[in-house]
Amino acid sequence: MGITFFAILLRIISNSMSNVYQKQLTAKAIDPFLINFIMYLGLTICCIPIIIRTTFLTFPHQIWTNAILGGMCGALGNSYLVKALKNGELSILGPINAYKSVVAMIFGIILLHEIPSITGLVGIILIICGSYFVFDTQEEGFSFKLLKRKDIRYRFYALIFTAIEAVFVKNVILYSDIKISFMFWSFFGMVFTGILLLPKLTNLTSLNQILTTKKFIFTRLLPVSYTHLTLPTNSLV
C-alpha cells in the first residue's frame, strides 16, 4: 500500500511537471509530434539495459498485440495533449485529466472485465462534482458548449486515447511485469509517433525548426522524458 501511494503521488507530481515543460515547448512553436517523439526516444534510451536482457521470442502474442495497440493510442493521445496545452490554460486543462480514471474504468470493464468497487464509484462521483466547480468558472459554464473550444476538445481526445492506452498497458503488465511494460510503452510510442512525424519531415520548415531549436529541445524535452518514467507504473490513475 505504501509503495502504491508513493507511486501515485510521484505520478501526480511528474505529470504536472511534464505538462509545464510541454507548455514551454509549444510556446516555441515546436511541433507536438516532435515533442512526443523526442520524449519517447529519451525513454527508449533509458530502457536499453532492459532491452539487452530481454528474450523477446518467448513472449506470447497477447503481449505484442496489447503493446502495439497501446503504442498507437499513446502516440495519438500524447500528441493531442500537447496540442491542447498549446491552445489552452493548464488551470482548466489539468482538471480534465481527472476524467481519465472514469474513461479507463469504462474500458477496463469492457476489455479487462474489471468491476469497480463502491469506493471507486464514490471517487468517480467526486471527480465529476469537482469538475463542475472548475468549469463553472468559464464563460460557457459546465455544458457541452465547452466542446466548441479547441483546447477542450483536444484535451478530451487525449484523455480518451490515453485512457484506452492505459488498459492495454495494464494488460501487458498482467502478461509480463512493469519493466517489460514500460519498455514496450516507450518503444512503440516512439515508433508510432515517428510514423506520425514522418510526413512533416518533408517540410523544410520543420527540418529547419529541428536544427535551430535543438538546444532548447534537449534542455526541455529531456526533463519531459524523465518525468514520464513513472507513468506506466500507475497507468489507470
Task: Describe these PLM feature segments.
Residues 25, 35, 84, 110-112, ...:
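Hydrophobic/aromatic residues within transmembrane alpha-helices
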Residues 42, 47, 106-109, 119-138:
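Hydrophobic transmembrane alpha-helices of multi-pass small-molecule transport proteins
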Residues 1-33, 144-180, 187-188:
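Glycine-/small-residue-enriched transmembrane alpha-helix faces in small-molecule transporters
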Residues 18-28, 75-92, 134-143, 196-206:
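C-terminal ends of transmembrane helices
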Residues 16, 71, 75, 102-106, ...:
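Hydrophobic/small/kink-forming positions within alpha-helical transmembrane segments
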